[in-house]
């Protein structure tokens, strides 16, 4: 397998990419042996556009309802919303989209991207992306703790939507100064 990867996959995947910047993550969580209903109930993915932002913002295709807080499809989306709202509330931008990308088996996101759509101040998008990595614990455990996701709130999200309701912790803007130190 290593020979096939070296000879065929890597040259195509890395074409035009500087080798110093390339990171190839191949099954970092190890052997995957559990499947079927024991590993996945199949109860997600029914309301993707309704549960997110419609066609206004892109999303990775992962559903929220039916997943617990350890699944970054759900908790990562909540954390991205939380960070974006706090960036705007702190005055770093008038408009903001935060993208978090995770790889299976990796605790930290493989990508953190802040896009202020040109509405940011002196701290450019790259600067804000770096500050977000430093200011927030973006591991699943860190997100669960920050947003108190072990509380029984999920019936309310399924019935009334996941975003735009101030009673959810990811809508809180009380920590808008968290980024200022970075």
Task: Cite the ranges covered by each PLM segment.
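Glycine-rich, flexible beta-strand/loop modules in the N-terminal catalytic cores of phosphate-handling
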Residues: 1-3, 44-69
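Accessory "access/gating" subregions that flank catalytic or transport cores
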Residues: 2-48
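Conserved active-site and cofactor/substrate-binding residues in soluble primary-metabolism enzymes
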Residues: 3-4, 45, 74-78, 82, ...
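Flexible, glycine/charged-enriched surface loops at secondary-structure junctions
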Residues: 11-28, 90-99, 140-147
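Short beta-strand elements
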Residues: 37-57, 100, 112-119
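Alpha-helical support elements that line or immediately flank enzyme active sites
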Residues: 67-91
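Internal helix-turn-beta structural module
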Residues: 95, 102-182
């Amino acid at each position: 397998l290593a020979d096939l990867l070296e000879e065929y996959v890597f040259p195509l995947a890395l074409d035009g990419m500087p080798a110093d910047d390339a990171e190839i993550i191949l099954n970092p969580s190890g052997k995957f042996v559990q499947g079927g209903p024991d590993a996945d109930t199949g109860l997600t993915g029914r309301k993707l556009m309704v549960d997110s932002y419609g066609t206004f913002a892109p999303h990775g295709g992962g559903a929220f309802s039916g997943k617990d807080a350890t699944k970054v499809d759900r908790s990562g989306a909540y954390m991205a919303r939380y960070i974006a709202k706090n960036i705007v509330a702190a005055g770093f931008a008038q408009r903001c989209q935060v993208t978090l990308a995770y790889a299976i088996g990796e605790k930290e996101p493989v990508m953190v991207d802040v896009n202020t759509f040109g509405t940011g101040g002196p701290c450019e998008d790259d600067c804000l992306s770096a500050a977000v990595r430093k200011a927030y614990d973006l591991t699943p455990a860190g997100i669960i703790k920050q947003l108190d996701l072990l509380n029984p709130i999920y019936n309310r999200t399924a019935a009334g939507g996941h975003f735009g309701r101030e009673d959810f912790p990811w809508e809180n803007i009380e920590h808008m100064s968290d980024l200022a130190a970075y």
